[in-house]
């Protein structure tokens, strides 16, 4: 890893009880928690064969070591059932939550596996400095609605929103300068392609990996403060952190601290 990558990992871990056991979700080729130093379980929603296949096709993974995961968190299956119900003390998810179709339900399952006082470290892309620039931030109503609907795959609406409103960020965009109108932006997909993919995922029950939710530091705090105040999520928010050592301009970090021992999903963490 580069010095910046090491600094980034050290900052995220500095707020976590890494002397105890934890979990990192979807580390891919950029794990935050070094399992040669810490007692951490690596988990992904796909198995090791699929992870290695994806890495082989990803130019960004060239020359990178892709660690094996210890367990598969199968979509629609509670996390505790996938890893065993051994209590954990922290969880890390870097650039993962935005891909999850039911973010509140997903976070509840993670909290169910943590001891009271346990921490979840979440690194997210900032809409204001990413391919999601032209999209609307995810709302409180959407987060709660998805937790009621419980989609196990990105929905046609989520697919449609991502494909039809994101743009191709090739790393040269100056987000500090005035941005062009969306109609002038370079896109990965046309509106017609977005419609076709949305119809396809419904017709074929296909899992298409997209950014299901869109966040800024302020919007995340606003939405999850309301979720917590509404009694839907027993946690305390710590952060957000931007511009921390080794971070990129297009990301931010927030921690959620579990404040209750009650099960959130109906699956007791100790059973």
Annotate the PLM regions.
Residues 17, 101, 115:
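Short conserved AdoMet
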Residues 1-18:
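Class I SAM-dependent methyltransferase Rossmann-like catalytic core
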Residues 95-99:
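A short His-aromatic
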Residues 6-11, 24-28, 105-107:
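Short alpha-helical segments and helix-capping/turn motifs at coil-helix boundaries
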Residues 91-92:
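Hydrophobic beta-strand segment of the Class I
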């Amino acid at each position: 890893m580069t010095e910046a990558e090491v600094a980034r990992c050290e900052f995220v871990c500095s707020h976590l009880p890494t002397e105890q056991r934890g979990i990192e979700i979807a580390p891919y080729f950029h794990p935050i928690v070094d399992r040669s130093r810490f007692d951490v379980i690596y988990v992904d929603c796909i198995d090791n064969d699929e992870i290695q296949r994806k890495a082989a096709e990803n130019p960004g993974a060239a020359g990178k070591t892709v660690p094996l995961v210890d367990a598969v968190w199968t979509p629609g299956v509670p996390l505790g059932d996938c890893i065993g119900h051994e209590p954990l003390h922290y969880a890390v998810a870097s650039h993962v939550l935005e891909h999850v179709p039911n973010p509140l339900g997903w976070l509840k399952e993670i909290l169910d596996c943590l001891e009271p006082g346990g921490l979840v470290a979440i690194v997210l892309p900032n809409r204001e400095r990413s391919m999601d620039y032209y999209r609307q931030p995810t709302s409180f109503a959407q987060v709660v609605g998805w937790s009621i609907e419980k989609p196990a795959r990105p929905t046609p609406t989520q697919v449609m929103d991502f494909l039809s409103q994101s743009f191709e960020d090739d790393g040269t965009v100056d987000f500090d300068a005035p941005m062009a109108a969306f109609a002038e932006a370079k896109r990965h997909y046309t509106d017609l392609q977005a419609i076709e993919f949305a119809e396809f995922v419904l017709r074929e029950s296909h899992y298409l990996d997209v950014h299901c939710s869109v966040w800024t530091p302020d919007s995340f705090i606003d939405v999850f403060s309301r979720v917590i105040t509404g009694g839907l999520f027993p946690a305390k928010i710590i952060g957000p952190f931007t511009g921390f050592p080794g971070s990129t301009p297009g990301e931010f970090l927030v921690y959620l601290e579990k404040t209750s021992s009650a099960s959130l999903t109906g699956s007791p963490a100790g059973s």
